[in-house]
């Protein structure tokens, strides 16, 4: 029997409250103490240092590094003219840039740890630090392919305003799209893992290095997806499921490389039917799963 339920499984309000506390304990044990001034976490900082100390670099430069730098902020060449390795790396940058722009914009709008009054507020601040740690891992991925000149550039004034206002929206309104965004990232990382053997076959050391860094991110994103699910009641979870297809298509339409790398239709199917059994056992073992998504007796949690 499958050990896990769908991510869309119903959850009682008491269960969700208890799961926030459980997630908060897991997060601190997994990622360490918050270094708020650095937007960092102690254990995540150690993980990055280990990857950097390995100093793994690709055997060869990209066939045309100038092509990468010309297209990594915005595609200016015909994507069909780019080799798949360059397409993969320009896509990765654009995806990570959205993440970086979002967390940078909302950082000042989220209560500091000292001003956080609830577990969920502490989680929000802490999780932003985790996301900044992910950007540092992405940066190391580009350095792995000897791309040392990239810069993290804001998306523009309009998008910056959008991201800055997001924390001001009520939780019931923002939770469903935020949950779908996490599910979109998790689904993407699973598909990227499948692409690595094909696109990076000639760079086995760099491929494995990137895969391990993506695994670190995937472990966190799996936990973030469950944590985001925890905010949502029955109406919101039904709305979330209906949002998957339009949100996925709208997001990937803005990343031209995705048409040449990803099967977005398949990703939508996987997200709509997602349960934790789809993940590798070692990833699940290092991550966090809500209690109501496990096939364990639930008698200890009272109804509400």
List each model region and its residues.
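Non-heme di-metal
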Residues: 1-304
């Amino acid at each position: 029997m499958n050990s896990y339920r769908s991510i869309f499984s119903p959850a009682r309000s008491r269960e969700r409250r208890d799961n926030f506390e459980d997630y908060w304990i897991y997060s601190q044990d997994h990622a360490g103490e918050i270094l708020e001034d650095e937007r960092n976490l102690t254990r995540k900082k150690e993980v990055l240092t280990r990857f950097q100390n390995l100093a793994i670099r690709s055997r060869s430069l990209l066939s045309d590094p100038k092509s990468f730098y010309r297209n990594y902020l915005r595609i200016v060449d015909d994507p069909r003219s780019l080799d798949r390795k360059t397409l993969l790396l320009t896509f990765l940058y654009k995806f990570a840039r959205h993440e970086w722009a979002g967390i940078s914009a909302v950082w000042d709008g989220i209560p500091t740890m000292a001003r956080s009054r609830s577990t969920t507020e502490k989680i929000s601040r802490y999780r932003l630090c985790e996301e900044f740690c992910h950007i540092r891992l992405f940066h190391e991925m580009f350095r792995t392919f000897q791309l040392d000149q990239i810069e993290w550039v804001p998306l523009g004034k309009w998008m910056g305003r959008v991201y800055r206002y997001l924390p001001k929206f009520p939780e019931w309104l923002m939770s469903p799209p935020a949950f779908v965004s996490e599910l979109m990232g998790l689904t993407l990382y699973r598909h990227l893992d499948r692409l690595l053997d094909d696109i990076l076959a000639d760079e086995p050391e760099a491929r494995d290095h990137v895969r391990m860094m993506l695994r670190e991110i995937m472990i966190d994103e799996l936990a973030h997806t469950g944590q985001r699910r925890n905010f949502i009641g029955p109406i919101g979870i039904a709305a979330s499921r209906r949002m998957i297809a339009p949100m996925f298509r709208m997001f990937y339409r803005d990343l031209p490389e995705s048409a040449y790398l990803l099967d977005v239709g398949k990703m939508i199917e996987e997200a709509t039917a997602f349960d934790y059994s789809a993940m590798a056992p070692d990833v699940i073992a290092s991550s966090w799963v809500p209690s109501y998504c496990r096939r364990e007796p639930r008698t200890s949690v009272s109804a509400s």
